[in-house]
């Protein structure tokens, strides 16, 4: 029988280590229930050369307002941990926990997420921030203010290979940025 630790025990603890499993991750199927997501996702799936945009589309819809149940659970956790010395290790790669107000240096996502990119070939074992100009253009396409043709796939500045989201499912996943 599994014993759940009462909130009072957490409040009395000097240090709290929180482990969050992949079950808390926003599922692709739930995103497909959002009308505009489904339409854009279908367009991208039809064109092989545009599939690199799919992770950006997913990132756009990983906002609290689209996932109130998961966001609510994280907000409750934040209340419980208020004023505590804590550290969170989350196997979820949806980055939703990063937008709740936790101290960023107290969160690690060893399976990656949607905030950093890496070379698809992992040529230099380094991470890159998602380019703000590219992100704004992708948002423009999602919001129907620019065309899909205006989006250019990001490339590694070192070797010219594609830049991909730094996530566990990538063939050359680089975990160094999260350790």
Say what each PLM segment does.
Residues 1-179:
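Conserved catalytic alpha/beta core of Sir2/sirtuin-type deacylases, generalized to analogous enzyme cores
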